[in-house]
Amino acid sequence: MLKIEELEEELKKDEINSLYLFYGEEKFLLENSLKKIKKSFGELINGINYITIDENNVENIISDLETPAFGFEKKLIIAKNTKLFSKDNKKGKSENLALKEKINKYIEQNIEMLRKCVVLIFVEETVEKCSLLQTIEKEGVVCNFEYQKASQIQKRLKAIFDAYGVKIENNMIIYLIECCGTNMQELINESRKLIEYAGKGGIVDKQTIDKLCIKKVESVIFDLTDSLGKKDTREAIDVLRNLILAKEPVQKIMITLYNHFKKLYLTKVALNLKKDVASSLNLKPNQVFLVNKYKMQTQKFSEQELRKIIQQLEDLDYQYKIGLIDLEVGFESILCAYCS
C-alpha cells in the first residue's frame, strides 16, 4: 500500500507503474494523480491508446488488454467503478466472482507482457479483500486516497501560496480551512482567489480571507454560537440573517445548528467523563482539527444550557412541521430567549 505523498513523488519523477488500484474519498487528489499519468502519455487517442471501462463493459477488459496500441508504445486503460472489488454488482454473485477470477488469472499470467505495453488503472469507491486485490498489491500499486488531515492540507496549501510568492502565516491557513472546509478542490479554488488578489509578494491575512472567501454554513454556525456564548443577541441575529440573505435554505440552517449544538453537548459530556472527544463525535481524520474549537465553545455553555437549546430546536422543528411557526421567527426567538 502506497501513501498518497509517496505516489505523488513517484509520478513527479515520471515513474509510472503498469498496474494501479486507486480508491477512497479524497477525489481531488485521486483525479490529480490520474491527470499526471495521462499527461505522461502525451497524445491519447480514444479507442487506440486510451480505453475507458466501467461496470457495464468490464467483461471486455481482457480483449482490450490484448489489443495492441497501434502506432503507440503503450496503452492506458482506466477501469472506473467496475465493482470488481465489492459485493455490490449488477451481475449475479457467481458471475461476478467468475469474471473477477478470470481477470485476476489473466493479470497473473501476463504481468510481464502488461508491463511492456499497458498501464491499467482500476478506480473504485471502496474495495474489499479478494484475490485480484492481492495480485495488484503484489505486482502493482494500491493507493487509498483517504481524506487528508488538517496538517497535510495545511502543508499542501502553503506549498501553493509559496509557489506563487504569496505570503500567508500558518495560523491563517488554519483559519482558511476552518472557514471553507476540508474539500481540496474548494480550498484550492479559494486559494486561487486569494493569490490573484494579493499578487506576488503580497500578504494574505484574516481580513483578506473574510473579504474574498465563501464561508461554509458550518463555519458560520461557529460564529453564531460564539455570539450566543457572549450573549450578544444583535450579533447572533445578524449572523443568522446574513446566512438567510446568502440563500442558505432555512431547513439546512436548522439541521446544521441542531447538529452543532448536539456535538457541543457530546463534547461537554466526553470532557466530563475524560473520554476522547474526536472518537466521541465520530470525526473523520480531516475533521479532527475541529476538536479544539468545540472544546473552546463548550466553555461558554453549561451542560444544562446545551440540553435546553437542543430541546428548543427539536420543539421548533415540530412546530414548524405542523405549521405553527415560521422557522426564521423561531430561530430569532430562541436566540433572544437564550441571550436574555
PLM regions and their residue ranges:
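Short helix-adjacent coil turns
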Residues: 216, 224, 228-235
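Short helix-to-loop capping/linker segments positioned immediately adjacent to catalytic or ligand/cofactor-binding
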Residues: 165, 224-225, 241-244
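Hydrophobic/aromatic-lined pockets within catalytic cores
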Residues: 199, 229, 244
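Non-catalytic interfacial helical region
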Residues: 1-8, 12-13, 17-20, 27-223, ...
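Helix-rich C-terminal "collar"/helical-bundle subdomain used as an assembly and partner-interaction module
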Residues: 1-5, 12-23, 67, 74, ...
